[in-house]
């Protein structure tokens, strides 16, 4: 069935619900789905029955891991008429291990609802998600949730939006009562009160519009006056009228708020208690009143895949050629690979062929759905401005651009941090081995920050990701969804080795005579450190002249050296940063072979390496810590104790920002230590920066550990 409001982009909102963990965003989303008619029964996060948290782990842990996408409709009552709006919602995780899920959601949204805990106000992860939304230029409205909670303070929460986020709040509502007495909200635009009367079985679906309680009248007048001052300054005509008459109409106030919101000059603030079914409907009105439609955001800009210097822009209409961005992939038990896309321009139907310009491959679109959490609603076309799920695409990955074959475009892809933690996993039985390979391939397809590789020497499978919670959940999903039981090792650091001194004219002769055809290969080689900052490269040079080694054997020498480098020198870690030059050698007419020269290359390196001053390299992380000033001394002392070096200290809104470089091996458990040192008020991000030489005392410990001493 084709959905009935796809044609009018003004009536579509693509929004995200974003927050700190436990601020109540999944419950808020549940209420939205209930009041928009998508849900007949309200699911509670603490009961493990939430619609958006449809993975088993999410329902058990009460947190949101994957961004579920859903479509719902809201009838906005304006004056005497109702107008229907389509709202596409992405529910995003608030846990630090799942920042990739948040990043990719924000990349394709037009607006967002930032949910805050009414007692805590802005919390560390709220700041992280807010900064991510700033990065992608996403307009937001704020919903101060949990107003029924003990200690809830609306005015404190508004203040933290100013002080901690450096944002300008536009207070459009005031709470009526607080904690157990929270009963509703004052609408400062209409100057009316909305009161929920806790009718049994009503679940907050109906509320009364009344006069503002007498004890709030003065405060409402004061806050309305501040709101009108802010709104009037958004527009010269409004300012002129306001200065003349001292008043603005409801429509003018909403238009002014909308302009400020879309330009990200200010952020409307509303309040309620999603769990107690209060304040959600006016928040939905605010979503359609203030957040942008696909037409309000700038045209998407990409470039010509054949020539990156040529910019192309696509307007959000079906008249422009088809272009879309893949922002998520998940696995469905029946349909297989589900590809979530944001369509920016044009349209596509089931059965059409599109170009994946990122991979330069054609793909055929099978079915097209709009999702309601894990339920699929088929549609007969995917059109500009909307979010859909495609089935049938084979080789697509997150961040790919899909476009019209005849009008190719590449949209800016998404960047994800490199994994920072690695663990070994092994299947418990032989039968689990193949199932584990399939499971890991599918799971790494879904999450760009999760990677899988095999250790050549031990044959172990190593999985890496952004944190221990993420890897725990991967292992849990293998067990639940793919029925794979596996053992999991302890977290490990990805060390490397390199050489610091050149070894010239290293000779090696491989000779074997055991009846029948023998083996013979002689090489003369130089091994030098490569001048490379991150120690990641390898160079092979052939300087053999006079045909002393025939050309067919040269690649075998190269392969032998690389194979030996994989095995390490001191502690079995892969060697990087080596320039290998073969200068001379000797061939036997009968006994020389590719295998003989591969062995000669390998052994030549193995004999030279111990003389080349080998050292161990460790990954160094660029760490940014944002902390309130009072904890700065403790945080810096802790970084120094972890062999870290402080690079800079700067002021940000309400916090000190410390940039440091710290070895990854010292960062395990850091999040817990930082929380306890700062009472949970500091936050940090880290990403791979470079490799650096390990100090001698640490190197000795690593070598002993690798040898099992």
UniProtKB/Swiss-Prot annotation:
GO biological process: ribosome disassembly
Gene Ontology cellular component list: cytoplasm
List of residues binding GTP: 19-26, 91-95, 145-148
Keywords assigned by UniProt, alphabetized: Cytoplasm, Elongation factor, GTP-binding, Nucleotide-binding, Protein biosynthesis
Keyword presence, Transmembrane helix: no
A GO MF term: translation elongation factor activity
Matching Gene3D superfamilies: 3.30.230.10, 3.30.70.240, Elongation Factor G (Translational Gtpase), domain 3, P-loop containing nucleotide triphosphate hydrolases, Translation factors
Pfam families, sorted: EFG_C, EFG_III, EFG_IV, GTP_EFTU, GTP_EFTU_D2
tr-type G domain residues: 10-295
SMART domains (alphabetical): EFG_C, EFG_IV
Main location: cytoplasm
SUPFAM superfamilies in the record: EF-G C-terminal domain-like, P-loop containing nucleoside triphosphate hydrolases, Ribosomal protein S5 domain 2-like, Translation proteins
Intracellular or extracellular location(s): Cytoplasm
Keyword hit for S-adenosyl-L-methionine: no
Cross-referenced InterPro entries: EFG_II (IPR041095), EFG_III (IPR009022), EFG_III/V (IPR035647), EFG_IV (IPR047872), EFG_V (IPR035649), EFG_V-like (IPR000640), EFTu-like_2 (IPR004161), G_TR_CS (IPR031157)
Chain's role: Catalyzes the GTP-dependent ribosomal translocation step during translation elongation. During this step, the ribosome changes from the pre-translocational (PRE) to the post-translocational (POST) state as the newly formed A-site-bound peptidyl-tRNA and P-site-bound deacylated tRNA move to the P and E sites, respectively. Catalyzes the coordinated movement of the two tRNA molecules, the mRNA and conformational changes in the ribosome.
Family: Belongs to the TRAFAC class translation factor GTPase superfamily. Classic translation factor GTPase family. EF-G/EF-2 subfamily.
Protein name: Elongation factor G
């Amino acid at each position: 069935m084709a959905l009935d409001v796809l044609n009018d982009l003004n009536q579509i909102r693509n929004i995200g619900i974003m927050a700190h963990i436990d601020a109540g965003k999944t419950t808020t989303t549940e209420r939205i789905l209930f009041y928009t008619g998508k849900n007949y029964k309200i699911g509670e996060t603490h009961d493990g029955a939430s619609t958006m948290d449809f993975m088993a782990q999410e329902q058990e842990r009460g947190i949101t891991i994957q961004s579920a996408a859903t479509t719902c409709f809201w009838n906005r009552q304006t004056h005497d008429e109702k107008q229907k709006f389509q709202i596409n919602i992405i529910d995003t995780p608030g846990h630090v291990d799942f920042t990739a899920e948040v990043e990719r959601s924000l990349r394709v949204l037009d607006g967002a609802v930032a949910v805050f805990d009414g007692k805590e106000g802005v919390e560390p992860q709220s700041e992280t998600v807010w900064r991510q939304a700033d990065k992608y230029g996403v307009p937001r409205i704020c919903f101060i949730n949990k107003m029924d909670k003990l200690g809830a303070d609306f005015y404190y929460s508004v203040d933290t939006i100013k002080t901690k986020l450096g944002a300008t709040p536009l207070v459009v509502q005031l709470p009526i009562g607080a904690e157990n007495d929270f009963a509703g909200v004052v609408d400062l635009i209409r100057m009316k009160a909305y009161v929920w009367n806790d009718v049994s079985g009503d679940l907050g679906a109906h509320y009364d519009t009344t006069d503002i309680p007498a004890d709030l009248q003065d405060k409402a007048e004061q806050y309305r006056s501040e709101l009108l001052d802010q709104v009037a300054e958004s527009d010269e005509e409004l300012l002129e009228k306001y200065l003349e008459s001292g008043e603005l109409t409801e429509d003018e106030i909403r238009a002014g708020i909308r302009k400020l919101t879309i330009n990200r000059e200010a952020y409307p603030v509303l309040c309620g208690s999603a769990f107690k079914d209060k304040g959600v409907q006016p928040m939905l009105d605010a979503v359609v009143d203030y957040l942008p439609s696909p037409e309000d955001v700038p045209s998407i800009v990409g470039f010509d895949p054949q020539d990156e210097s040529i910019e192309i822009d696509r307007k959000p209409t079906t008249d422009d050629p088809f272009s879309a961005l893949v922002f998520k992939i998940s696995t469905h038990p029946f349909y297989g690979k589900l590809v979530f896309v944001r369509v920016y321009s044009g349209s596509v139907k089931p059965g059409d062929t599109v170009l994946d310009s990122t991979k330069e491959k054609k793909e055929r679109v099978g079915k097209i759905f709009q999702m309601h959490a894990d339920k699929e609603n088929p549609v007969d076309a995917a059109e500009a401005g909307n979010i859909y799920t495609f089935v049938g695409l084979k080789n697509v990955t997150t961040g790919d651009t899909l476009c019209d074959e005849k009008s190719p475009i590449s949209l800016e892809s998404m960047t994800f941090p490199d994994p920072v933690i690695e663990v070994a996993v092994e299947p418990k039985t032989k039968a689990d081995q193949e199932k584990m390979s399939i499971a890991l391939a599918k799971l790494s397809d879904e999450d760009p920050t999760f990677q899988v590789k095999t250790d050549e020497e031990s044959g172990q499978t190593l999985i890496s990701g952004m944190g221990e919670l993420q890897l725990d959940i991967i292992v849990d999903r293998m067990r639940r969804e793919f029925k794979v039981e596996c053992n999991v090792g302890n977290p490990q650091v990805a060390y490397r080795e390199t050489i610091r001194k050149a070894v010239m004219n290293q000779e090696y002769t491989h000779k074997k005579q055991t009846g029948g055809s023998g083996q013979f290969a002689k090489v003369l080689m130089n091994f030098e450190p490569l001048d490379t900052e991150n120690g990641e490269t390898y160079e092979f040079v052939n300087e053999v002249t006079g045909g002393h080694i025939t050309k067919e054997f040269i690649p075998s020498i190269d392969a032998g050296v690389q194979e030996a480098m994989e095995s390490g020198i001191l502690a079995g870690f892969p060697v990087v940063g080596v320039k290998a030059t073969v200068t001379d050698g000797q061939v036997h007419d009968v006994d020389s072979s590719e295998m003989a020269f591969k062995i000669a290359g390998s052994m030549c390196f193995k004999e030279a390496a111990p003389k080349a001053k080998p050292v161990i390299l460790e990954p160094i992380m660029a760490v940014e810590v944002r902390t309130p000033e009072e904890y700065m001394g403790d945080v810096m002392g802790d970084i120094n104790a972890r062999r870290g070096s402080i690079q800079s200290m700067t002021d940000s809104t309400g916090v000190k920002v410390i940039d440091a470089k710290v070895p990854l091996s010292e960062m395990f458990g850091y999040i817990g230590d930082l929380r306890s040192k700062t009472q949970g008020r500091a936050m940090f991000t880290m990403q791979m920066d470079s490799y650096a030489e390990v100090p001698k005392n640490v190197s000795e410990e690593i070598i002993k550990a690798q040898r099992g001493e």
